[in-house]
Amino acid sequence: MAKIAVFDSGLGSLSIIKEIQKIMKADIVYFADQKNYPYGTKSQAQMASIIKKTICMLEEKFTPDVIVVASNTPSLMLNLQKGKVIDVKPPLKLAKQKTKSKKIGILATKSSVKSKGLVNYVKENN
């Protein structure tokens, strides 16, 4: 059975965990990073340090097969898709397909809006 670690700074991870449980049986470790709540106010450098430390801690304590960064903010600000780390990002293409106008709005944290990652992600998915 796969060991999956899922984390963010709030409760958003719970919806990700629910979806994982629908598609597979896995031992899931949930880490709510309350110490660094909220992620949305952190600079890119702060976010990089927080995420690196959290991933290392999860690796050391739980040795998961997969680590899911279940927060849009670090997923958009940092390049996280390496090795066993998976991030989550808004499903822009799917959202556009579901609208008649093909125009969508994006709700984002202050840090996400300031980062080039959000702009690049929108360009890539437009």
Segments and roles (model prediction):
Residues 1-126:
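Non-catalytic structural scaffold of enzyme domains
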